[in-house]
């Protein structure tokens, strides 16, 4: 995930996300790579095995934005050469657009200059849709859940996978503080 997508990284949020994933039994890799092709290039130094990246539609659309590759002499073509080296596949998680339509690799929109490049990767099987998803989950956004937690709103627990809310509460992640924690003990003013 690119946590810098909305500007500067909130260090506490970043560490809480990593801690939550670890507590849920997931492996977390933290790096200073801001481009996907650099992550792939790094792992290519240690493994000859085929690699895959799972990402959401919005992340894939961003990958096709030339502004991220201006510092490379070969521009976006150099980056994509490194990214798709060794038959890398992108497994694409859908999203809903502003009209509520599900966006997949079949109907996503990239900049007109990138359209043919995207079609090349799609046609050659480099972009594969994740089909096993629950459409109701496409209406849940981490930023919304985080705001609910920080404001002390109810209902955020139901938006998360089983066991996740319990870890957030127990470890007091994302500024979570339940009412019991906010009450002062009897006799203290």
Model-derived features: positions:
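Nucleotidyltransferase catalytic core that binds NTPs
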Residues: 1-189
């Amino acid at each position: 995930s690119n946590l810098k997508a909305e500007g500067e990284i909130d260090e506490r949020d970043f560490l809480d996300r990593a801690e939550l994933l670890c507590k849920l039994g997931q492996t977390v890799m933290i790096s200073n790579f801001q481009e996907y092709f650099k992550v792939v290039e790094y792992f290519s130094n240690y493994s000859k095995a085929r690699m895959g990246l799972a990402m959401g539609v919005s992340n894939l659309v961003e990958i096709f934005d030339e502004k991220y590759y201006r510092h490379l002499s070969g521009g976006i073509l150099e980056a994509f050469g490194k990214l798709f080296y060794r038959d890398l596949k992108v497994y694409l998680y859908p999203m809903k657009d502003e009209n509520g339509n599900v966006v997949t690799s079949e109907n996503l929109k990239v900049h007109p200059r990138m359209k043919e490049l995207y079609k090349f990767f799609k046609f050659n099987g480099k972009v594969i849709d994740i089909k096993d998803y629950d459409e109701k989950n496409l209406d849940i956004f981490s930023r919304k859940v985080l705001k609910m937690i920080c404001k002390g709103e109810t209902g955020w627990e139901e938006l998360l996978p089983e066991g996740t809310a319990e870890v957030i509460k127990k470890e007091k992640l994302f500024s979570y503080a339940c009412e019991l924690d906010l009450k002062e003990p009897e006799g203290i003013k």
